């Protein structure tokens, strides 16, 4: 049996190193994406809580036909919910960027740019 040429062994070793590096990078990116997805879920729960609180606080005013209080509560909660929705939109942009990076792990820079 002939010995394996050094060039073949070097190529094999480089391939293993490249694969390990790509796996580590993919793991890093996926963990960042998972963190952002958890943050989105948390903010969505904040929205749900704000809407539930709104219902509890507004119901008595609606029973008493106090439209000014109802309107004020609505304005306050809408502002809060809009802020949460902006946070979610920003996190979703980051998630989309991470998805693109994950898809491009291991691709040549020229191929990834296309």
State what each model feature region is.
Residues 87, 91-114:
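Long amphipathic alpha-helical coiled-coil segments
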Residues 40-57, 93:
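Amphipathic, heptad-repeat alpha-helices with coiled-coil/zipper character that mediate oligomerization
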Residues 51-78:
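Short E/K-rich amphipathic alpha-helical oligomerization segments
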Residues 25-46, 82:
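Short, charge/polar-rich alpha-helical segments
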Residues 27, 61-65, 102:
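Secondary-structure edge/capping motif, primarily at the C-terminal ends of alpha-helices
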Residues 8-32, 67:
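Short, charge-rich amphipathic alpha-helices with coiled-coil/heptad character
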Residues 14, 41, 45-48, 75-89:
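Generic structural signal for well-ordered, non-transmembrane alpha-helical segments
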Residues 33-36, 77, 91, 95-98:
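Long, non-membrane, amphipathic alpha-helices that form coiled-coils
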């Amino acid at each position: 049996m002939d010995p394996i040429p050094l060039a073949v062994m070097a190529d094999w070793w480089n391939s293993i190193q490249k694969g390990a590096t790509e796996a580590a990078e993919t793991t890093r990116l996926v963990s960042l994406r998972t963190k952002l997805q958890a943050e989105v879920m948390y903010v969505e729960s904040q929205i749900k809580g704000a809407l539930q609180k709104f219902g509890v606080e507004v119901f008595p005013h609606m029973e008493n036909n106090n439209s000014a209080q109802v309107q004020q509560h609505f304005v306050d909660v809408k502002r809060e919910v809009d802020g949460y929705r902006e946070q979610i939109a920003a996190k979703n942009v980051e998630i989309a960027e991470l998805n693109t990076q994950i898809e491009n792990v291991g691709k040549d820079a020229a191929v990834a740019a296309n």
